[in-house]
UniProtKB/Swiss-Prot annotation:
NCBIfam families: Dxr, PRK05447.1-1, PRK12464.1. One of its GO terms (molecular function) is 1-deoxy-D-xylulose-5-phosphate reductoisomerase activity. Catalyzes the NADPH-dependent rearrangement and reduction of 1-deoxy-D-xylulose-5-phosphate (DXP) to 2-C-methyl-D-erythritol 4-phosphate (MEP). Mn(2+) binds at residues 150, 152, 231. The lineage of its organism: Bacteria, Pseudomonadati, Pseudomonadota, Gammaproteobacteria, Enterobacterales. 1-deoxy-D-xylulose 5-phosphate binds at residues 125, 151-152, 186, 209, 222, 227-228, 231. It holds the Pfam family DXP_reductoisom. Its cofactor is Mg(2+); Mn(2+). The gene is dxr. Its EC number is 1.1.1.267. This is 1-deoxy-D-xylulose 5-phosphate reductoisomerase. Pathway: Isoprenoid biosynthesis; isopentenyl diphosphate biosynthesis via DXP pathway; isopentenyl diphosphate from 1-deoxy-D-xylulose 5-phosphate: step 1/6. NADPH binds at residues 10-13, 36-38, 124, 126, 215. It comes from Salmonella choleraesuis (strain SC-B67). InterPro entries: DXP_reductoisomerase (IPR003821), DXP_reductoisomerase_C (IPR013644), DXP_reductoisomerase_N (IPR013512), DXPR_C (IPR026877), DXPR_C_sf (IPR036169), NAD(P)-bd_dom_sf (IPR036291).
Amino acid sequence: MKQLTILGSTGSIGCSTLDVVRHNPDSFRVIALVAGKNVARMAEQCLEFSPRYAVMDDTSSAEQLKIMLQQHGSRTEVLSGQQAACEMAALDEVGHVMAAIVGAAGLLPTLAAIRAGKTILLANKESLVTCGRLFMDEVKRSNARLLPVDSEHNAIFQSLPQSIQHNLGYADLEQNGVTSILLTGSGGPFRETPMCDLAAMTPDQACRHPNWSMGRKVSVDSATMMNKGLEYIEARWLFNASARQMEVLIHPQSVIHSMVRYQDGSVLAQLGEPDMRTPIAHTMAWPNRVTSGAQPLDFCKLSALTFSAPDYQRYPCLKLAMEAFEQGQAATTALNAANEITVAAFLAQQIRFTDIAGLNLAVLERMDLQEPASVEDVLQVDAIAREVARKQVIRLSR
């Protein structure tokens, strides 16, 4: 039986992870749950899965949770704060850590899991976007293992030869017969919206993804295709891919989750219903397979599968992310931090949808982008970029 810590248990990925556990009670046991401030959902999870530990972001939320659990006779030990989250990621009895805390808050707990030599089920984009080389070096040093949870990276992983799967981030694609990686994305809810109408799009409209069920921040990132830009950066690190070995395609149906092109002309793809429980179950059970709870793909009900190249005028955030990778980790860190602030401002209706990309670019142009040599350096770049972004938002929304 595999023993789990779930970082970000009350979020979308965390809830889906627990659903896979629910479908496979003899295969997985939850040792620790870590979340932000959603006390009600955490209480439900603790009462159902009886973890040994539960960690909340702050002491107030932890106290509320403790009272609720005591009322139900739960023996789960309640803790709070980032240090406790890091300790849960490194518990001796835990072998697998689901890293699903959204944003820079997930960096240190994920790093703690890596340094403890765990198998990390990586759903936190920021880990590689901001700390790609640092994290990949730490993985090698600690003999940890990264298994990508993002549907696209998981699809690529499944389509790659075992020689690359067992040497992620360091294997030479060309030496293993791989020509390129094809990263697919739906194009989001505004793929066919006239360009002149994009400025008027509301947060609710941006969060109506045509295929996937996601949180609001990730939904906006899908609408701008910043999500795909961050995935591009991740893929470069995960698969040791050069720019010429990467292709990005718009695939509106979200049936083919990504592909790998081989030197002999073959293209291997992973297909499935757009349900995050599939890649989650794959990483949890790898190299075996378990039931995920997802519906099987019905080929007879499929319409045409279509593909097109992304329009960078429609999706400037995608281009921005691709260019940031070439500038280095300070640039990708600053871009990610700026984007978190600008998306939050859009969701709060402080700025327009079309302001997001321009503000992100403005932050990059105003930053002194010196390469970080440690996670502490990364966090400093992150903090400075956030402050610059906040000032830009205030200036624009006056």
